[in-house]
Amino acid sequence: MSISASLVKELRDLTGAGMMDCKAALAATEGKIEAAVDWLRAKGIAKADKKAGRTAAEGLVGVAASGNKAVVVEVNSETDFVARNDAFQELVRKIAQAALSTDGSSEAVANANVDGKTVTEAAKDAVATIGENISFRRSAALSVPQGVVATYIHNGVADGLGKLGVLVAIETAGDAEAAQAFGRQVAMHVAAVNPLALTSADVNPEAAEREKAIFIDQARQSGKPDNIIEKMVEGRMRKFYEEVVLLSQAFVINPDLTVEAALKDAEKAIGAPAKITGFARIALGEGIEKEESDFAAEVAAAAKG
């Protein structure tokens, strides 16, 4: 089949692999991007930690908390300039507050009440005053029956607003202030490391099987016997889980400890057993690719208009 230049560019952007390698990968996988990424990884050409997607949308992520519940929302705009607009920031705050009265699902938040309108309607109405297309994109919420939900905003532009928001739920009957302090540290860790799951049991089985298949292909290239290959794959899968599972990861604040060990250590200050029951992480524009504009063409078009 014919492999287009745009497909090769997309694969290069995703993997950092060379043009000829990308062409070969696409030819071997009938032009399927995801399969081509796996093909390159199996050959040792692409790294697993290369992000499969680019972030390009603008706007803000906002967090809000009340009692033992917290929410994180994402509201998109067309330019970063609008993200610094007071009216836009106030809208994001109101949407985050409205989200607290819901279960946190994107559908529920879209229909939540903001000044007598739904969130979706409020975002549309803001277009007239702010001058750009505004849209509520997604949300998440966490709560605990007893304990705290810590929040963290990275690259903050105002209180509770920034480019990346994280929630971490800690269930405990102990000191709330100490639990909050530790929860915020874990939230900072989640912001930096971006774990896939809380525990190994929570890892998507398809994702785990996909990694295993890649490791098997890589191990077979060593030419070693099957029993050695099996042990090699077991070791690599163990390392995979250590890298993507929150509780098993080396704690960013103290890399000598895993997050789980750091939690046990934090129980001394909390004064009671504590358990991380969940986390949520929303990065602005994650999974959205904004169309790149040709500035010269825009100027020429404006001059003609």
From Swiss-Prot:
Localisation: Cytoplasm
Superkingdom of the source? Bacteria
**Span list, region Involved in Mg(2+) ion dislocation from EF-Tu:** 79-82
GO molecular function terms listed in the Swiss-Prot or TrEMBL record: translation elongation factor activity
Q: Which Gene3D superfamilies match?
A: 1.10.286.20, DNA helicase RuvA subunit, C-terminal domain (1.10.8.10), Elongation factor Ts, dimerisation domain (3.30.479.20)
For this UniProt record, the keywords arranged alphabetically read as follows:
Cytoplasm, Elongation factor, Protein biosynthesis
Q: Say where the protein is mainly found.
A: cytoplasm
Alphabetical list of Pfam families matching this protein:
EF_TS (PF00889)
List cellular component terms (GO). cytoplasm
> Does this entry carry the keyword Protein biosynthesis?
yes
Q: What does this protein do?
A: Associates with the EF-Tu.GDP complex and induces the exchange of GDP to GTP. It remains bound to the aminoacyl-tRNA.EF-Tu.GTP complex up to the GTP hydrolysis stage on the ribosome.
Family statement drawn from the similarity comment of this UniProt entry: Belongs to the EF-Ts family.
Protein name, per record: Elongation factor Ts
Tell me the organism: Brucella canis (strain ATCC 23365 / NCTC 10854 / RM-666)
